[in-house]
Swiss-Prot record:
Superkingdom of the source species: Bacteria
Protein name in UniProt: Protein SlyX homolog
UniProt signal peptide: none
Coiled-coil region: none
Taxonomic placement: Bacteria, Pseudomonadati, Pseudomonadota, Gammaproteobacteria, Alteromonadales
Gene: slyX
Similarity annotation: Belongs to the SlyX family.
Length: 70
């Protein structure tokens, strides 16, 4: 009977460690989700700033006249 009791105790110990690991991983996922949400907010703000910028007075490469050949 002691063998069965030892196995039960071993399983209970393993379960306790697994529950702790699951909780630690859950906290890490929560932290990463907050970080992703913050980064998404920053990206949306940058997109808005880029869209609000005045177009540049410089010509694009397609509009630029080719350099003279020497």
């Amino acid at each position: 009977m002691q063998g069965v009791q030892a196995q039960i105790e071993d399983l209970e110990t393993k379960l306790a460690f697994q529950e702790l690991t699951v909780e630690e991983l859950n906290q890490e996922v929560i932290k990463l989700n907050r970080l992703v949400a913050h980064q998404q907010h920053q990206i949306h703000m940058l997109i808005g700033k880029l869209q609000d910028m005045e177009p540049s007075n410089m010509a694009t490469q397609a509009e630029e006249t080719p350099p003279p050949h020497y």
